[in-house]
Design a protein with these regions (language model features):
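N-terminal single-pass transmembrane signal-anchor helix
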Residues: 5-27
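Aliphatic-rich helix starts adjacent to a transmembrane/signal segment
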Residues: 29-53
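GGW-centered surface loops in extracellular recognition modules
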Residues: 78-150, 237, 241, 246-248, ...
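Short aromatic-cysteine micro-motif
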Residues: 123, 133-135, 225-436
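Surface-exposed, short loops/turns at beta-strand junctions within beta-sandwich domains
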Residues: 192-198
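Conserved structural position at the C-terminal beta-strand
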Residues: 204-206
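Edge beta-strands of extracellular beta-sandwich domains
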Residues: 211-219
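Disulfide-stabilized, aromatic/cysteine-rich ligand-recognition loop
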Residues: 328-342, 348-349, 353, 428-429, ...
Length: 495
């Protein structure tokens, strides 16, 4: 008999009835819960957002009553803050004119002091001047005049708190007019006086939101706190990569276990920098702000005669090319000798460089693209270090300054060779017309971390450029005198 492969009529009717019941239940659920309506609204909003995404601005897009910066932020449930913070450095230039007493002329926007002559260079690449009597040379480092930080805040709710921190984490509670920074309403505009280079952070709170913004200030005649942090972070990243360890493990290693994490190290650096004082900065702030900059010696301090540990301070100090390094001098005597570099003039003041001069000069090199930020923390490409390689013509020593040779033909300083060079004998070390800021000799400054120690900067020829880059600091007792420490002078136009 042929077997029936279909279903009975009764079974078919039962199946249809069950399906109708299920459809009715599903429709009832959708209607009662308004899922269709929600889906339509979301779909419409999303479609509209996609259509308008190419027109996104600072206001973002609104989906279902909330603002998002991008479609991705909407997908990831990351709405925009209801608080907006804008921070910027402002400045107000004042005219500098040639008065015939302090200033002889203005060349390329730079004041040339009486008793000096313009040699070469532009304002953004290094204007060089020369003493009409001694032939010592100096380079102008520009600084914006009357700098302030302007902070503008807008919120959709009443602002309940504004916290402003300087690069050391110190709270700023006064504005530039020394009035309290008050909190009121949904907007706030404050203007503050920046005190040091580094990161300034503003945190704003309302009843339902909180936002922060950071501004890195590099343009001041002041210490740079944040660059010290960034230099250590560069060391940590390099060590972590080379040793295949975490950055926290690298932070612990380079601090000898004193810091267990990178965050702890950053906090420690801030605390450390609070101990670094430099009273010489305030002495010259008026001149720097009035004239819009300062002069730094083009060369490390030089001497006509080769120096030894018993040389004393009788040699005249020079800022000229191809002189013997003025080494074997302690910090105290460096202050005295640096002050003589105005050659008795009263329209300019000479002084041992301070931390503001050093940090501002390096930041200026970065601003003008003479060096990259990475090259400030690994200065192999522009400094005389053990691991650098370049050609030079002039004086050099291969035995830590005991004996010098002078070459008149281009000579190669090979990698992993240690040469103490005469001043400015290779353009390899020249940036914006300034020589040897990176390597060759450590350079004394007026900065101090304690009552008995003083800071020298820039590294030296026996070290690698990553261990002691241009931004590095080292501490020595003020009476230390070594073959690898020299100094440099700065010039300030008199008020």
């Amino acid at each position: 008999m042929k077997k029936n492969k279909g279903i009975t009529l009764v079974a078919l009717i039962i199946t249809i009835v069950v399906m109708l019941i299920l459809v009715a239940v599903s429709i009832n659920i959708l209607v009662n819960s308004n899922l269709i309506g929600h889906a339509e609204k979301t779909g419409d909003a999303y479609a509209g957002a996609i259509k308008n995404e190419e027109n996104l601005g600072n206001d973002g897009i609104t989906i279902n009553g909330q603002k998002y910066a991008t479609i991705d932020d909407y997908i990831n449930h990351n709405p925009m803050s209801t608080i907006k913070i804008n921070m910027e450095v402002t400045h107000e230039d004042t005219a500098v004119t040639a008065d015939g007493t302090n200033i002889k002329s203005i060349e390329h926007g730079v004041p040339i002091p009486v008793g000096y002559s313009y040699v070469t260079g532009e304002k953004n690449t290094g204007v060089v001047i020369q003493d009409d009597t001694t032939s010592d040379q100096f380079v102008w480092v520009p600084v914006l005049q009357n700098q302030k930080i302007k902070i503008e805040i807008t919120a959709e709710e009443e602002i309940t708190e504004i916290k402003i921190e300087d690069p050391l984490g110190t709270l700023i509670t006064k504005n530039s007019e020394n009035n309290d920074i008050t909190v009121s309403g949904k907007t706030n505009t404050s203007i503050i006086n920046p005190t040091t280079n580094g990161e300034y952070t503003v945190t704003v709170k309302t009843a339902s939101d909180e936002a922060s913004k950071t501004l890195y200030v590099k343009s001041l005649y002041a210490q740079d706190i944040t660059s010290m942090r960034d230099m250590y972070l560069a060391v940590i990243k390099k060590q972590a990569k080379e040793q295949n360890i975490t950055e926290d493990e690298a932070a612990k290693a380079i601090t000898g276990g004193q810091c267990n994490t990178v965050e702890e190290l950053i906090t420690t650096i801030k605390q450390m920098m609070q101990q670094y004082t430099d009273s010489d900065i305030a002495t010259h702030e008026g001149s720097v702000n009035k004239y819009g900059g300062f002069y730094i010696a083009r060369y490390e301090a030089g001497s006509e005669n080769q120096r030894t540990s018993s040389s004393g301070t009788g040699n005249a100090v020079l800022s000229q090319a191809n002189k013997y390094p003025y080494n074997y001098i302690n910090q105290t005597d460096s202050i005295t000798k640096a002050a003589t570099m105005n050659n008795g003039k009263t329209n300019v003041t000479a002084s041992l460089i301070n931390s503001a001069v050093w940090d501002r000069t390096l930041n200026w090199l970065e601003e003008t693209n003479a060096v990259t930020r990475a090259e400030l923390f690994d200065s192999t490409s522009w400094g005389n270090y053990r691991n650098s390689k370049f050609n030079f013509i002039g004086k050099y020593s291969t035995d830590d300054g005991d004996n010098f040779t002078e070459t008149t033909a281009s000579t190669q300083k090979s990698e992993n060779k240690c040469y103490l060079l005469g001043t400015g004998v290779t353009d390899y070390t020249k940036k914006n017309n300034i020589y040897d800021l990176a390597g060759n000799c450590w350079e004394w400054t007026t900065e101090s971390p304690s009552s008995s120690t003083r800071v020298n900067r820039g590294g030296h020829y026996n070290h690698t450029a990553f261990d002691t880059p241009a931004y590095t600091r080292a501490d020595d007792s003020a009476d230390s005198s070594y073959y690898n420490i020299s100094f440099r002078s700065a010039l300030y136009v008199s008020l």
